[in-house]
A protein has these predicted regions:
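Core catalytic ATP-binding domain of two-component histidine kinases
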Residues: 1-179
C-alpha cells in the first residue's frame, strides 16, 4: 500500500511540475503590425553576428529587394529568428572541427514573403526530424526541448507554414512562409 501511495504522490507531484513548467513557456497573443521583413531579418542578423563570430561561424544575409511588408508581432518574431540562428550555430559548433569545413549560416528572404535559414552543420536525421517540435524533446545534452515548441507556437499563431529538415545537398533549412 505504501508503494501505491508513493507512486500516486509522485504522479501528482510530476503533474504539478509539468503544469508549472508549461506556464513558463506561455506565449502571449501576437500584437501584429505591418513590418518590413528585410529590416527585421537584418536587425536579427546584426544582433546574432557577435555570437556567430565568437564560434568562428560565418553569418550571411541575402535579402530579396522584392520582399515587402508582412503582418507580424516583431518582438515575437525576433525571438523566433534568434532561436533558429542560435540552434543552427550550436549544431555547427557541436560538429566541431571534425567536419573539416567552415561553419556557415545564411539567412535569406525571397519574395513574396519567405524566410529561409540555411546551415552547413551535421544535419538532422529523419528519426529526429519527426520529433523536433515535440515538447521536452532535445538533441542537446542539457536541452529542455522548449525552444522549437516556442517557435512552432509563434509561427502557428501567425498563420505561417514552416519546415525544418536536412536536404540531399547536406544543408539544413528552416523555411518560414507567410500566408
Amino acid at each position: 500500500c505504501d508503494v501505491m501511495r508513493v507512486c500516486t504522490e509522485r504522479c501528482f507531484s510530476m503533474s504539478h511540475f509539468i503544469t508549472r513548467f508549461a506556464d513558463v513557456v506561455k506565449i502571449p497573443e501576437p500584437t501584429v503590425a505591418q513590418v518590413q521583413l528585410n529590416e527585421l531579418v537584418s536587425m536579427c542578423k546584426r544582433f546574432m553576428e557577435g555570437m556567430c563570430n565568437d564560434r568562428n561561424i560565418i553569418l550571411r544575409l541575402e535579402c530579396d529587394p522584392e520582399v515587402g511588408q508582412v503582418r507580424l508581432d516583431a518582438s515575437l518574431f525576433e525571438q523566433v529568428l534568434v532561436n533558429i540562428i542560435k540552434n543552427a550555430a550550436e549544431s555547427i559548433e557541436s560538429a566541431g572541427e571534425a567536419a573539416g569545413k567552415q561553419g556557415e549560416i545564411t539567412v535569406r528572404t525571397t519574395a513574396p514573403a519567405l524566410i529561409e535559414i540555411v546551415d552547413n552543420g551535421p544535419g538532422i536525421s529523419k528519426e529526429t526530424e519527426a520529433k523536433l517540435f515535440s515538447p521536452f524533446f532535445s538533441t542537446k545534452p542539457n536541452g529542455q526541448g522548449i525552444g522549437l515548441v516556442f517557435i512552432r507556437e509563434v509561427l502557428s499563431r501567425h498563420g505561417c507554414a514552416f519546415s525544418l529538415r536536412t536536404y540531399n545537398d547536406g544543408l539544413t533549412r528552416f523555411r518560414i512562409l507567410f500566408n
